[in-house]
Amino acid sequence: MTREKVPAKGKARTSGGPGEPVYCSFCGRSSQEVDSMVAGPNAFICDRCIRTSHDILRKELSAIQHPEPVADQPFPVKLVSPKALMESLDQYVVGQERAKKALSVAVYNHYKRIDSQEWQHDDDEVVIEKSNIMLIGPTGTGKTLLAQTLANLLEVPFSIVDATSLTEAGYVGDDVETILARLLHASDFNLERAERGIIYVDEIDKIARKSANVSITRDVSGEGVQQALLKILEGAVVGVPPKGGRKHPEQQLININTKNILFICGGAFEGLDRLIARRMSKSSMGFGAGVADKKAGYDPGILKFVMQDDLHEYGLIPEFIGRLPVLSSLEPLDEHALRSILVEPKNALIKQYAKLFEMDGVELEFAPESLDRVVAIALERGTGARALRSVLENVMIDIMFELPSMKGIGKCIITADTIDGTGSPTYLTEDGKKKKTA
């Protein structure tokens, strides 16, 4: 009995007799491994290689026959690896390593999924589902900045919507379709660009159900909005008024397919830490109970232990939670993080003010102790990075009002007294001498 020898790829093998297998000249598979085999002069090709060749030719012919301007082509997304995405985020967002890593992986997989749809076959058994993202963290920790920075890095349209403005259809407020209209505006009405954009829904915790008990009064801005968002989050063709606002019977609508739009929802979820601590206390025994007792101090850092059941208890319906499978939390910003935010990112606040002063021909310098005072005041206000801009704007507004009218100024030094409002900045002339001010 002799063994069949598989020929090398690229060489055809004809059957030596009835029932003997033949092999594909391209991939080397035998006729027993594939559904069908097409014979040619001294060559064979299997159905799998035919299908692959068809896909390649279809793409190449389409590109040749339909050359279009870049803006009108099916919108390509610049696919960046998760590691490269995170390295880019590091240049703009301080800290929040866990959230940045989770976002980078989720965004990479989302756009990889979109690309795969172009070459996947209809008979493919594995269908990759959409993975929208939920960001949980105290105010001012960078939720919006993370989403916006990702959109900028990927060069996709981006829009921000406040969930508190949304109501059910038929009630005063914005329909949920409004969020798609804003994305359409952000993409300059390029439908294909819009259908691959990112929408950030802020204050998502504010549409939590007000009570676990079913009420006879309608919750038009709570559970009702969650129900209305389900279809959009999952992926559906939605008719959108081009100018936003309410739909009217005779109004022309633009149909947007949301299956490839990435939704990132964010919220502070005030009080969620207590629910998490209570759950951990109930489930902990022995030594673990001591750990849970410490968590019962309701440190916002406990948010990293959040589970979907906690969000359900908070007031989000299970169907809504299920459409936001990627769950990540952000940590409160401490003194070190706030100090870094002031000076380290590419678009740091200090660098922005320095650029504005440079346009007036003046060098701006912040004394180290002045930065300490800005951070201390921001911590007292408890609104995270947002407080930094508020503190600085309050200090700098008078200086920026007077400076353009002052002559011979080469340098402006901000001191701790300047931040406290008990002293003026130090001005130096262009030759380095101290400038007297009235």
Swiss-Prot record:
CDD domains, alphabetized? RecA-like_ClpX (cd19497)
Identify a single GO molecular function assigned to this protein: protein dimerization activity
GO biological process terms, alphabetically, are:
cell division; proteolysis involved in protein catabolic process
InterPro entries according to UniProt: AAA+_ATPase (IPR003593), ATP-dep_Clp_protease_ClpX (IPR050052), ATPase_AAA_core (IPR003959), Clp_ATPase_C (IPR019489), Clp_protease_ATP-bd_su_ClpX (IPR004487), ClpX_bact (IPR046425), P-loop_NTPase (IPR027417), Znf_CppX_C4 (IPR010603)
Provide the residue positions that the database annotates as binding ATP.
Answer: P138, T139, G140, T141, G142, K143, T144, L145
One GO location term (cellular component):
HslUV protease complex
Q: Name one Pfam family in it.
A: zf-C4_ClpX
Query: Any idea which UniProt keywords this protein has?
Result: ATP-binding, Chaperone, Metal-binding, Nucleotide-binding, Zinc
Residue positions binding Zn(2+): C24, C27, C46, C49
Question: Which parts of the sequence belong to the ClpX-type ZB domain?
Answer: 11-65
What functional role does this protein have?
ATP-dependent specificity component of the Clp protease. It directs the protease to specific substrates. Can perform chaperone functions in the absence of ClpP.
Q: How does it assemble?
A: Component of the ClpX-ClpP complex. Forms a hexameric ring that, in the presence of ATP, binds to fourteen ClpP subunits assembled into a disk-like structure with a central cavity, resembling the structure of eukaryotic proteasomes.
The record's similarity note reads: Belongs to the ClpX chaperone family.
Name recorded for this polypeptide: ATP-dependent Clp protease ATP-binding subunit ClpX
The organism that produces this protein has a lineage beginning with: Bacteria, Pseudomonadati, Chlorobiota, Chlorobiia, Chlorobiales
Give the gene symbol: clpX
